[in-house]
């Protein structure tokens, strides 16, 4: 039997070289995955803010302790079948106790700011009146620690979570009293936290609140006409419009309080956060172009038009007629110009077309009033790759068009891109979850289009990724993961994904 000796040295050298180069190439492949596509902090103007975003109900947990009152979502999640796997947000990712760990993560990843929301019912368990000082103490701890770590707080006052007490007292957002109660709550927050918080937002996605809560009833408080959803009460033809009217007035009243009593001294600003799906005409036909414009008017225009011009879009006035509330002269003065900046939550784009055949609907409702057909493909070709959520397609050019639309149609207000991101399924393993190269591509492509819009004159001054953490994703519960940090829901341990490392690389400062 021939003796099996070591390979001769030239062969050994060859083997060593090949193993070195293959190791080097796998290292280089990993580096390529973190490649920022030419983007860096220096691609954006000095002072451009990069942050991440979450909301109180989705990340805090501790819903029943320390004096917090229930919100409409605490009641809604208890209805069997409303939330995937009947999940609740009682613990979620427990930021209430782990906020220091989360702020430390933001710092390590080179972010500048954190957009969080304050739970109205944690401050005022009954919606008004008695203050829960333990809740106030929590937000003081969170804000103080952010400031200590050099993370700028962006505080949102309302993210879907109306105090349940107000829903029971006067039907919540359907009651005119909510305008004063919200302004009182906002003023308390300015007075209490405004020495450190200089960036305030009144409402997150108020359109979603009105449409999903009162037109099809799939969100809390679950009201709609029977023709449009499984609701026990509601009126899709009128309630979404009444709710929106009250939301706009509540926003304007809160801004008025800030400008009158706090802005000069605190030197902060107040805005609102609006969701904006870009609607692209399916064809070049006049009918499809009109359908796309109708969709934009009923979507973003419903809120931004009154805030900039003091009235609802003409399209809406002509279609909704007497079902659309009107602003008084005094209200117009309060509403018009009531934004120091506007946040745009931009995730995706859809095709819009004129429905065929066009028939007069039997039942009236907000979505029905659009009279459009949604499309996610053209000539069999999808508009973009789909994320896990059925509504979310990766269409980066829609970001550019949405921002340029705001520039051209609404006087180029100061804007922050206040949410942007994509999800993976909730059941991905840790290894799969960490290797989120699709998310990196999503962020790279969308940020490239944001930069293009900025270069073409859109006044965008900040960008917030949704979300810092995997968390409670409303109807999807824990079956959808939007975070750049993976959370093990059993242990609540945080694991930064590749996308988090990508942001760390992107946001390196020159002196690092």
UniProtKB/Swiss-Prot annotation:
<dbReference type="GO" id="GO:0080083">
    <property type="term" value="F:beta-gentiobiose beta-glucosidase activity"/>
</dbReference>
<feature type="binding site">
    <location>
        <position position="419"/>
    </location>
    <ligand>
        <name>a beta-D-glucoside</name>
    </ligand>
</feature>
<dbReference type="Pfam" id="PF00232">
    <property type="entry name" value="Glyco_hydro_1"/>
</dbReference>
<feature type="binding site">
    <location>
        <position position="466"/>
    </location>
    <ligand>
        <name>a beta-D-glucoside</name>
    </ligand>
</feature>
<dbReference type="GO" id="GO:0046872">
    <property type="term" value="F:metal ion binding"/>
</dbReference>
<dbReference type="GO" id="GO:0047668">
    <property type="term" value="F:amygdalin beta-glucosidase activity"/>
</dbReference>
<keyword id="KW-0479">Metal-binding</keyword>
<protein>
    <recommendedName>
        <fullName>Beta-glucosidase 44</fullName>
        <ecNumber>3.2.1.21</ecNumber>
    </recommendedName>
</protein>
<dbReference type="GO" id="GO:0080082">
    <property type="term" value="F:esculin beta-glucosidase activity"/>
</dbReference>
<dbReference type="GO" id="GO:0080079">
    <property type="term" value="F:cellobiose glucosidase activity"/>
</dbReference>
<dbReference type="GO" id="GO:0022626">
    <property type="term" value="C:cytosolic ribosome"/>
</dbReference>
<comment type="subunit">
    <text>Homodimer.</text>
</comment>
<feature type="binding site">
    <location>
        <position position="58"/>
    </location>
    <ligand>
        <name>a beta-D-glucoside</name>
    </ligand>
</feature>
<dbReference type="GO" id="GO:0004567">
    <property type="term" value="F:beta-mannosidase activity"/>
</dbReference>
<dbReference type="GO" id="GO:0005975">
    <property type="term" value="P:carbohydrate metabolic process"/>
</dbReference>
<feature type="binding site">
    <location>
        <position position="482"/>
    </location>
    <ligand>
        <name>a beta-D-glucoside</name>
    </ligand>
</feature>
<dbReference type="GO" id="GO:0009505">
    <property type="term" value="C:plant-type cell wall"/>
</dbReference>
<dbReference type="InterPro" id="IPR017853">
    <property type="entry name" value="Glycoside_hydrolase_SF"/>
</dbReference>
<keyword id="KW-0732">Signal</keyword>
<feature type="signal peptide">
    <location>
        <begin position="1"/>
        <end position="23"/>
    </location>
</feature>
<comment type="similarity">
    <text>Belongs to the glycosyl hydrolase 1 family.</text>
</comment>
<feature type="binding site">
    <location>
        <position position="159"/>
    </location>
    <ligand>
        <name>a beta-D-glucoside</name>
    </ligand>
</feature>
<dbReference type="GO" id="GO:0005576">
    <property type="term" value="C:extracellular region"/>
</dbReference>
<feature type="glycosylation site" description="N-linked (GlcNAc...) asparagine">
    <location>
        <position position="230"/>
    </location>
</feature>
<feature type="active site" description="Proton donor">
    <location>
        <position position="205"/>
    </location>
</feature>
<feature type="glycosylation site" description="N-linked (GlcNAc...) asparagine">
    <location>
        <position position="86"/>
    </location>
</feature>
<feature type="glycosylation site" description="N-linked (GlcNAc...) asparagine">
    <location>
        <position position="427"/>
    </location>
</feature>
<feature type="disulfide bond">
    <location>
        <begin position="224"/>
        <end position="231"/>
    </location>
</feature>
<keyword id="KW-0326">Glycosidase</keyword>
<keyword id="KW-0862">Zinc</keyword>
<comment type="function">
    <text>Hydrolyzes p-nitrophenyl beta-D-glucoside, p-nitrophenyl beta-D-mannoside, cellobiose, 4-methylumbelliferyl-beta-D-glucoside, laminarin, amygdalin, esculin and gentiobiose.</text>
</comment>
<keyword id="KW-0378">Hydrolase</keyword>
<dbReference type="InterPro" id="IPR001360">
    <property type="entry name" value="Glyco_hydro_1"/>
</dbReference>
<keyword id="KW-0325">Glycoprotein</keyword>
<dbReference type="GO" id="GO:0008422">
    <property type="term" value="F:beta-glucosidase activity"/>
</dbReference>
<keyword id="KW-1015">Disulfide bond</keyword>
<feature type="binding site">
    <location>
        <begin position="204"/>
        <end position="205"/>
    </location>
    <ligand>
        <name>a beta-D-glucoside</name>
    </ligand>
</feature>
<dbReference type="GO" id="GO:0080081">
    <property type="term" value="F:4-methylumbelliferyl-beta-D-glucopyranoside beta-glucosidase activity"/>
</dbReference>
<feature type="binding site">
    <location>
        <position position="347"/>
    </location>
    <ligand>
        <name>a beta-D-glucoside</name>
    </ligand>
</feature>
<keyword id="KW-0964">Secreted</keyword>
<feature type="binding site">
    <location>
        <begin position="473"/>
        <end position="474"/>
    </location>
    <ligand>
        <name>a beta-D-glucoside</name>
    </ligand>
</feature>
<feature type="active site" description="Nucleophile">
    <location>
        <position position="419"/>
    </location>
</feature>
């Amino acid at each position: 039997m021939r003796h099996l000796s070591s390979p001769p040295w030239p062969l050994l050298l060859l083997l060593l070289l090949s193993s070195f180069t293959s190791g080097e190439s796998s290292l280089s492949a990993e580096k390529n995955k973190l490649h920022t596509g030419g983007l860096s902090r220096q691609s954006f103007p000095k002072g451009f803010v990069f942050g991440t975003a979450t909301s109180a109900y989705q990340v805090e947990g501790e819903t029943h302790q320390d004096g917090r009152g229930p919100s409409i979502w605490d009641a809604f999640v208890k209805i069997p079948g409303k939330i995937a796997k009947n999940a609740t947000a009682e613990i979620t990712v427990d930021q209430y106790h782990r906020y220091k760990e989360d702020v430390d993560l933001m710092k390590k990843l080179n972010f500048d700011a954190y957009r969080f929301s304050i739970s109205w019912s944690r401050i005022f368990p009954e919606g008004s009146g008695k203050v829960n000082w333990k809740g106030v103490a929590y937000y003081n701890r969170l804000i103080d620690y952010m400031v200590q770590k050099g993370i700028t707080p962006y505080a949102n006052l309302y993210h879907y979570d109306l105090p349940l007490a107000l829903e029971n007292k006067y039907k919540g957002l359907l009651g005119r009293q909510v305008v004063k109660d919200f302004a009182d709550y906002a003023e308390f927050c300015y007075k209490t936290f405004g020495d450190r918080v200089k960036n305030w937002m009144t409402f997150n996605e108020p359109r979603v609140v009105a449409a999903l809560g009162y037109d099809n009833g799939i969100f809390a408080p679950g009201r709609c006409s029977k023709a449009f959803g499984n609701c026990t009460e509601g009126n899709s033809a009128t309630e979404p419009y009444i709710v929106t009217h009250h939301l706009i007035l509540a926003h304007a009243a809160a801004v008025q309080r800030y400008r009158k009593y706090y802005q000069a001294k605190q030197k902060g600003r107040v805005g609102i956060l609006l969701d904006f799906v870009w609607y692209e005409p399916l064809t070049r036909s006049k009918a499809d172009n009109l359908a796309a414009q109708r969709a934009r008017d009923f979507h973003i225009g419903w809120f931004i038009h009154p805030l900039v011009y003091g009235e609802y879009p003409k399209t809406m006035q002509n279609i909704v007629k007497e079902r659309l509330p009107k602003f008084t002269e005094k209200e117009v003065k309060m509403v018009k110009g009531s934004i120091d900046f506007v946040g745009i939550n931009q995730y995706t784009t859809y095709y819009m077309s004129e429905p065929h055949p066009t028939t007069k609907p039997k039942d009236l409702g907000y979505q029905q009033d659009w009279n459009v057909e949604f499309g996610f493909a053209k000539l069999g070709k999808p508009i973009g790759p789909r994320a896990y959520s059925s509504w979310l397609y990766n269409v980066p050019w829609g970001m550019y068009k949405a921002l340029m639309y705001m520039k051209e149609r609404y006087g180029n207000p100061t804007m922050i891109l206040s949410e942007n991101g994509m999800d993976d399924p909730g059941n991905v393993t840790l290894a799969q979850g960490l290797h989120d190269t699709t998310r990196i591509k999503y962020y790279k492509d969308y940020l490239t289009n944001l930069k293009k819009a900025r270069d073409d004159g859109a006044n965008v001054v900040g960008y917030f990724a949704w979300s810092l953490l995997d968390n409670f994703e409303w109807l999807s519960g824990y079956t959808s993961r939007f975070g750049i940090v993976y959370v093990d829901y059993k242990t609540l341990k945080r694991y930064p994904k590749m996308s988090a490392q990508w942001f760390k690389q992107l946001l390196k400062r020159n002196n690092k």
